[in-house]
């Protein structure tokens, strides 16, 4: 509770956000205003969470948008009487910190903790309603001990394994990347390096065990953006089809298995294509063919990020089509991927666009086996026919609809053992090994006698060593640290070595939301009872770029830990909001391709490059140092205040859309808050002076106030924060126009209501003006107002008047008029008399509140 002696006198009529915001932030902290209430059950809880930040050192506007959106939602729910959990932490492990530490010659721990301290102070400037008592960083030993604990839980459940595999290697960061961390151009998600392939022994999690549930349960996520669900659906990539086994004529002991979703086209297969690394290639003896394949490998490696030519190499290998015993040549093709399916595909040129192009280029037969309707004749195709139809050239299946033939041919194959039904996923197991120091150590000991042995949970944590050399040329800093790496086997007791790989940072962020409800729990990762009370997260806010990394991994972790009986929830995040980017004007010289700093441009309305006088293109792009278009949040807060920054961020664009920074828009919000300030300063001086009261003004203000309550409440619930602020502005206009013309009770009620409605958006000024008009408790401890539906009723309505069914006029009618009064008012109107004069009115039909029809 905020006591009266904590109030401050206002010495100036000018709005001074710096003074106001510092004052209230201090008082809120002192009074533990945002400490989370204890929950007895989960009926009145609301868990609001932003994706926690990586401590890069400085807050940027993208951060501000994320945290302000979540804060608004958390504050609103607290006003609605919910017990709100709104925590904050730090995603602190990872390569950026390690690389920054190497550059500066300091430890990643020192670098990270310094950045956390600075960013926390910046976040506090925003006036967030965060419960800082629950704060943690993933690099804290008392956090990552539980990441190791959960790793062992997954190990016991059979979800962790190690294997040697070809992996994505980042040559700049010297570490392995998961498939999800390689972009569509084959580049590292972080360093931007061209990713290479390397053979290493790695640790994996069996996320594929949950592929079907992860896919199916997307249907439960009604409050997730559709595009995020589509991205996850595509990434999981479920295909229901058939594995077809082709015998190899030249090598009877061998079989070539091909996955297909189109067994109905099996009679149209005129070639099979395999990848450059397929195991069958070992059976090719012709040296010229082998050399061509080697050349193709080099071409693929060199051009992996470019559009590939459809290159084919015909081999001496011949397969046998199981449906008709016809020979099929086997080709090595540039478009076949090692990692998808079996590394081999059927070539059906007549009914696949890619196969048609490949066949035309390489002079391969094209055999049509599906026609649009039965009356069509077999003819030479100008392009692949990819629609449904009826089979031809397919023996006993001729004339059968291809959708039916698909099932029948598959059934024949299963019965005759040359096919099996198969469900296939694009999703691959999650590779979690990283060959760097600054990550969570993997709690495994490598013993020459026992192999890889998991530690007992009582032996945790495996702490990172502090005496470590992580200079730039060190590939395996942990392995080279003899004091740390040498240990004894927990199984047999002989000399052994600790695992020197660390975990992917996404391991730490895949469960952090489970820690907050019991963040101080000393002997387990979380209290089950607290998880079952607080989870799932009611509102999660973060960038769409995490759709197939963090969000998919977090869903997997939740399901896997549920199956280990650690809690009962199925999904971690009930409602997801993916905010758009914050963009600002960037000035680009299209001749040089370089960006020019605005500070170097004389006239921003007609920008030219000061070096070569070229006219610059103005682009709105994501803020970045390289484009000279970053806006420092601290400088904005210093100049205009946090409340102005918050109002701008929330008003400028709907939260899911990209937001374009504009100084004039920021100034507009500052002026709006200044007008509010001036109104309340004047009201504070005259709050007890009786006003003249005018019924019409009072009625209008009551109506405006109730409209504002209703619309702002609905807008916040629907994440339409920009329109909520528009409604707030309308209410302000009504309030300022009538404040001196209404009775004192209504004046106080309206001023009080406006304060509460403003508070989630601009919490500091709302608190200050609340106390200016005489209230002692914090405005943030108030209840959200309810609207009065009666006050929203109109005095009159528009009545449509028809004569013989045709609209002739529209008239405003008071609600209290009866039918006789309505007739008396309307029948003598000139526009109606024009159509009824000298005519017999046979009937008048009135549908009150809507329409009146005069039949003449």
Swiss-Prot record:
The keyword NADP does not apply. Signal peptide: none annotated. It catalyses: tRNA(Leu) + L-leucine + ATP = L-leucyl-tRNA(Leu) + AMP + diphosphate. Keywords: Aminoacyl-tRNA synthetase, ATP-binding, Cytoplasm, Ligase, Nucleotide-binding, Protein biosynthesis. One of its GO terms (molecular function) is leucine-tRNA ligase activity. GO terms for biological process: leucyl-tRNA aminoacylation. A motif ('KMSKS' region) lies at residues 622-626. A motif ('HIGH' region) lies at residues 53-63. Its EC number is 6.1.1.4. GO terms for cellular component: cytosol. ATP binds at residue 625. It comes from the Bacteria. It is found in: Cytoplasm. Belongs to the class-I aminoacyl-tRNA synthetase family. This is Leucine--tRNA ligase. It comes from Prochlorococcus marinus (strain MIT 9301). The gene is leuS.
């Amino acid at each position: 509770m905020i006591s009266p002696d904590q109030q401050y006198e206002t010495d100036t009529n000018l709005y001074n956000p710096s003074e106001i915001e510092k004052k209230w932030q201090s008082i809120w902290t002192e009074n533990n205003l945002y400490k989370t209430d204890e929950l007895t059950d989960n009926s009145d809880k609301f868990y609001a969470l932003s994706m926690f930040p990586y401590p890069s050192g400085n807050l940027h506007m993208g951060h501000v948008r994320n945290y302000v959106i979540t804060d608004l939602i958390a504050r609103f729910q607290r006003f609605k009487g919910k017990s709100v959990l709104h925590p904050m932490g730090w995603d602190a492990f990872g390569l950026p910190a390690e690389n920054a530490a190497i550059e500066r010659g300091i430890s990643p721990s020192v670098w990270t903790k310094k950045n956390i301290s600075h960013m926390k102070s910046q976040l506090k400037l925003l006036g967030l309603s965060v419960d800082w008592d629950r704060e943690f960083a993933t690099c804290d030993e008392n956090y990552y001990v539980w990441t190791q604990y959960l790793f062992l839980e997954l190990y016991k459940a059979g979800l962790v394994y190690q294997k040697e595999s070809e992996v994505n290697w980042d040559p700049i960061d010297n570490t392995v990347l998961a498939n999800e961390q390689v972009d569509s151009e084959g580049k590292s998600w972080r360093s931007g390096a061209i990713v290479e392939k390397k053979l290493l022994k790695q640790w994996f999690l069996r996320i594929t065990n949950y592929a079907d549930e992860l896919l199916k349960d997307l249907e439960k996520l009604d409050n997730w953006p559709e595009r995020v669900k589509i991205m996850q659906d595509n990434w999981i990539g479920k295909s229901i089809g058939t594995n077809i086994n082709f015998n190899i004529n030249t090598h009877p002991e061998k079989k070539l298995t091909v996955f297909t979703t189109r067994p109905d086209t099996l009679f149209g297969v005129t070639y099979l294509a395999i990848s450059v690394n397929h195991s069958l290639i070992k059976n090719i003896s012709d040296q010229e063919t082998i050399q061509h394949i080697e050349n193709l490998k080099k071409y693929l490696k060199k051009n992996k990020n470019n559009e590939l030519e459809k290159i084919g190499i015909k081999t001496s290998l011949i397969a046998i089509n199981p449906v008709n015993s016809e020979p099929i040549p086997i080709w090595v093709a540039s478009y076949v991927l090692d990692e998808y399916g079996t590394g081999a595909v059927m070539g059906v040129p007549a009914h696949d666009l890619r196969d048609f192009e490949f066949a035309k280029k390489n002079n391969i037969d094209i055999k049509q086996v599906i026609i649009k309707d039965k009356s069509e004749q077999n003819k030479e195709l100008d392009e692949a026919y990819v629609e449904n139809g009826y089979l031809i050239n397919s023996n006993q299946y001729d004339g059968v609809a291809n959708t039916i033939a698909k099932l029948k041919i598959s059934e024949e194959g299963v019965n005759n053992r040359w096919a099996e039904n198969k469900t296939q996923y694009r999703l691959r197991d999650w590779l979690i090994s990283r060959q760097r120091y600054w990550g969570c150590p993997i709690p495994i000991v490598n013993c020459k006698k026992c192999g890889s042995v998991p530690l007992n949970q009582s032996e945790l944590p495996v702490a990172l060593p502090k005496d470590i050399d992580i200079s730039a040329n060190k590939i395996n800093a942990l392995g080279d640290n003899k004091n740390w790496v040498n240990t004894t086997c927990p199984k047999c007791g002989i000399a052994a070595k600790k695992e020197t790989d660390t975990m992917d940072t996404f391991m730490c962020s895949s469960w952090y939301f489970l820690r907050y409800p019991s963040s101080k729990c000393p002997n387990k990762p979380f209290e089950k009872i607290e998880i079952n009370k607080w989870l799932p997260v009611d509102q999660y806010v973060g960038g769409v770029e995490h759709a197939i990394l963090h969000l998919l991994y977090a869903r997997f972790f939740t399901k896997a830990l549920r199956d280990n009986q650690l809690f009962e929830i199925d999904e971690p995040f009930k409602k997801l909001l993916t905010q758009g980017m914050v963009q600002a004007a960037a000035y680009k010289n299209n001749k040089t391709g370089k960006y020019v700093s605005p500070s170097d441009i004389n006239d921003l309305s007609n920008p030219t490059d000061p070096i070569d006088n070229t006219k610059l293109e103005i682009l709105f792009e994501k803020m970045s140092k390289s484009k000279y278009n970053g806006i420092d949040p601290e400088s904005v807060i210093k100049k205009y205040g946090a409340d102005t920054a918050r109002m701008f961020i929330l008003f400028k664009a709907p939260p899911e859309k990209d937001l374009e920074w504009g100084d004039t828009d920021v100034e507009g919000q500052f002026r709006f808050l200044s007008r509010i300030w001036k109104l309340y300063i004047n009201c504070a001086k005259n709050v007890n002076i009786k006003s003249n009261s005018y019924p019409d003004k009072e009625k209008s203000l009551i109506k405006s106030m109730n409209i504002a309550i209703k619309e702002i409440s609905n807008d916040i619930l629907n994440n339409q924060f920009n329109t909520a602020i528009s409604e707030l502005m309308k209410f302000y206009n009504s309030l300022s126009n009538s404040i001196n013309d209404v009775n004192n009770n209504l004046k106080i009620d309206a001023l009080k209501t406006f304060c509460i409605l403003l508070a989630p958006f601009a919490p500091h000024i709302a608190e200050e003006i609340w106390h200016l008009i005489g209230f002692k408790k914090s405005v943030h401890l108030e209840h959200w107002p309810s609207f009065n539906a009666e006050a929203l009723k109109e005095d009159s309505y528009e009545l449509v008047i028809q004569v013989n069914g045709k609209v002739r006029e529209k008239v405003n009618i008071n609600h209290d008029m009866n039918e006789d009064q309505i007739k008396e008012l309307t029948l003598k109107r000139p526009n109606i008399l024009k159509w009824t004069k000298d005519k017999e009115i046979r009937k008048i039909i009135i549908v009150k509140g809507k329409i009146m029809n005069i039949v003449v």
